[in-house]
């Protein structure tokens, strides 16, 4: 989206929820000052908080010690926008080590963490430490394809999956908080056809396109058009996704 389109989307969502729900803006600018300006525009458009992405040059080259902490500090100080810490997958060089996570989560303005480390050894090791050291931090799973494993350790989900299946995901969060594995497993199994058709693809970016087809199946979007560099899915994918949504009993809304 262009900068103007980003602001328009935030304003449209703020208007549509009539101030009943907080609107979280993704802050993705590469440079720290650029990200701070993006956060200021989000505040002006009505966003309640921001999900601050890592600088994407770090994906390939890694980051200098202290740079992520500085990014969160500057963006919050210059914009006043409350921030969600975003943990990237362990297979990238933009993933934060435990010390960095603890440092950022202790900084002013950081109130939650969206954790998508996608390494269950790290998850099982680091989440208990973060819980102990930062008890007031909201921990949100980013693991669309691993919700069952992570549901028992979190305060909620911050996942694209929530766009297409909010009803069963809310049930799964409740089951996780209650320690009800049987219920959580039932929901996992019910959703598995959707999980496979949307997220078990060659690229996670294909899941973004697949999500749009699922939103069409639910009657939320009229079409699944995407912009480059995203591309349409292969022939037959639309039917596969619609069939999976029906199998999971996720019908049209409204």
Where do the PLM segments sit?
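A general structural signal for well-ordered alpha-helical segments in protein cores
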Residues: 6, 10, 35, 72, ...
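Active-site beta->alpha loop and helix N-cap motifs at the rims of alpha/beta catalytic domains
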Residues: 1-95, 231, 251
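Catalytic alpha/beta core domains of metabolic enzymes, predominantly
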Residues: 74-78, 89-195, 199, 203
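Residues within well-ordered alpha-helices
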Residues: 38, 100, 145-146, 211, ...
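C-terminal alpha-helical cap/extension of soluble enzyme domains
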Residues: 153, 168-254
